[in-house]
Amino acid sequence: MADKSSVSGLKLIGEGIPENIPSMPDWDESVDHAPPRRQVLTANEKQLALRNALRYFPTEQHASLAAEFLQELNTFGRIIMWRYRPTAYEMKAHPIQQYPAKSQQAASIMLMIQNNLDPAVAQFPHELITYGGNGSVFQNWAQYRLVMSYLCKMTDEQTLVMYSGHPLGLFPSSSDSPRVIVTNGMMIPNASTQDNYERLNALGVTQYGQMTAGSYMYIGPQGIVHGTTITLLNAARAHLGLNGDEGLGGVTFVTAGL
């Protein structure tokens, strides 16, 4: 039987960013928290990171939030917006019929996102990291709130476009189109470095979603086994001439730690 308070609270999942600045949730020592990140931004870049974060909020709230977000940036190395972590409902995969969505496909995505952030599942749930130390679902809690609001409104003839946790909006599509198109970690490997990625991540313009964190479909180690198998199968088809009906039987794979 569903917990009545949880079901009632779940009705608020589509509220988006509250009109008024919410109270700061208590720091929860019962969950693991991500360690502070390296300080990689200059003073001018920190101002840019603040502007990027404040774009989600009305101008009249910027003065109140800027100091808090700067403190997060200076102590943690990223702006997480802990103040906006929802507490009215339990963060877990609820029965799909409990989600206040117009589209069951959208409700299933909401369920998957909440599963990725479930404290019983995620590595650092309050920092929106599912696994691997940096496998992020979103960059901050404002993005989570906006995405849940969009998914509540979505119909089966719309597509939500995501860019490293940032929702670009709902776009007209068709019932045969994807409900969500996700991109993460948009870096050019041969023209970039780890330091450059960390800088852009601290600025709030890119995130690393790992294989199944930023795509909302983490199912534990079996997901990585599945993804790795598909990767190897496609490599064998491309380089060994396997057709679509052949498996990897008889193929020797040598790895240096994959």
Residue ranges and their predicted role:
Residues 1-104:
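Intrinsically disordered, low-structural-confidence terminal and linker regions
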Residues 100, 106-248:
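Glycine/serine-rich phosphate-binding loop and adjoining beta1-alpha1 elements at the start
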Residues 248-258:
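Glycine-rich adenosine-cofactor-binding loop
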Residues 86-87, 137-138, 157, 253-255:
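Short linear motifs at secondary-structure transitions and domain/linker junctions
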